[in-house]
Amino acid sequence: MISVIIDTLRESALRIDALLKHNTSGYLQSTNASGDMQLEIDVEADRIFQASLLELPCVKAICSEEQEDICYSQSTDAPYIVAYDPLDGSSLIDSNLSIGSIFGIYNGELKAQSLMASGYVVYGPCLEMVVAQERALHYRYIDEQWRNLGALELQAKGRINAPGGTQKHWEAKHKMMIESLFAQGYRLRYSGGMVPDLHQILIKGGGLFSYPATNDAPQGKLRKLFEVFPFAFVYEKCGGYATNGVQRILELEV
């Protein structure tokens, strides 16, 4: 059943990619559930995912970063809940940078321990998708079909450093850590989009992505269900590690 959900996400990604190629949308006079200003294409991408996922008999509900409430399907006894960010990094569209979609497939409950599969889509020069279950598999859309490029694996030591958040608000200990990475020869690679930045680290073999709690956002800004848990799951399947600085991400409560 999870394969059916993933196939549906692939088809939705194709539709969203086509929208992005002809996008002329602007900002709406509204914000999403996280308080971010919405673009018209954010809302349209959300509609595409919602409509296609709620038609599946195996999906009980969907939980979108763009909406306040969980949306339930008519399949009340179905096992899976899909949480997703339909268009992560959409503020980069006007710069013509890569953006993405993020998803997590949960069994029964919205908690990290119930995550059965996760992944993301990259809308860039090529359309790509990474899906993690037992391993994290890398796909690219070529000649009108999805090609499996193989499993992604992180090296023992990377060279990319992607630190997010406003530097002047970083805590001293985080600033010291980032400076120590640069002193070790790590290279700065940060676009402001979670999907392209984390994807680059995987493709290039390793590194560190961080978006810490700051003085102006003491709880951090990343959302667990739609962003943090799915990417933590992917990275662990690639041989990496995800932490909040105290404990493993996939042991955290929602």
Residue map of PLM features:
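Alpha-helical coupling/stalk and coiled-coil linker elements that connect catalytic or binding modules
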Residues: 27-28
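IMPase-like, lithium-sensitive Mg2+-dependent phosphomonoesterase catalytic core
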Residues: 1-22, 31-32, 37, 43-254
